[in-house]
């Protein structure tokens, strides 16, 4: 009897999918609506993880675009310093850049979590694949809930950048970034480029690091919103040198599953054939970008199987007030089922069912 119950539970678990909400409308108001779909329990101090952009950067999510979600959550924008040489590699330079890029306008609250490197805290990777520990800024302790706001785009080192990249490199302190880039071999940034890990180990290390942030915050108190607009092949850290987007704006995704939302972003780009699609996907493949998604699923922080649930946009097809790309107005089904490993999971379910019958 117990065996039968366990196998039935296995079958049911096999068919569980994460919900990913999708809208073609890209607007400040829609960001709030997408967050509401997640039914999060945002308690206490809410951190809104952003990318501050670089000098003269064009494509990062602008603070004015995020104003409504900032007001709705009564949150605080949070960022971390870079390890590579830039204005963001020092807290003083980073603060000036934040001001230049408009983040402090209207007395918006913004915190650099690793402002003081001596306050870094060590987080243990519970199911390590490449690294055993991650290091993040000590001010993470000041926040009870997190909304990860990601500009989904390419990345010249990780293949692409979305929720998992924000959770890993985005949250890591300078010490943590070094650990990720060297797959746990070093904590001193001077080794990061000279002794950088191979792509497979680097992308796996990002998944490990991402898991520490997911584990740090209680379930229901962390969610993810990704904006698929201005989809350059380079990260927002490229600043003014980022190549112009060659993929049309697609929309906004929201989920409580960082693996599912990144997988959905990649799937939408695959299905949205534009002149820049092949170049984007080739970069993801060449840099083993999807390995981060695969390893993150293996660790257990999310699933590549998801339901894509369409949230209707404005009837006139308005794509918002801070983006230049066009969005296709074709109607979608309310729920589309996608699966990164559906065949394997279906096989597992059938095997379990056969055992139950026999």
Walk through the language-model features, giving the residues of each.
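Cleavable N-terminal signal peptides of Sec/SRP-targeted secreted and luminal proteins
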Residues: 2-13, 347-357
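C-terminal GPI-anchoring signal of eukaryotic secretory precursors
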Residues: 329-347
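C-terminal helix/juxtamembrane-tail motif
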Residues: 309-317, 349-358
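Intrinsic disorder/low-complexity segments
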Residues: 1, 320, 327, 344-345
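Extended, low-polarity segments enriched in aliphatic/aromatic residues
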Residues: 15-72, 76-320
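Intrinsically disordered, low-complexity segments enriched in Ser/Pro/Gly/Ala and basic residues
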Residues: 3, 17, 314, 338, ...
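Proteolytic processing junctions in secreted/extracellular precursors
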Residues: 8-16, 338-343
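Ser/Thr/Gly/Pro-rich low-complexity, disordered linker/stalk segments of secreted
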Residues: 316-334
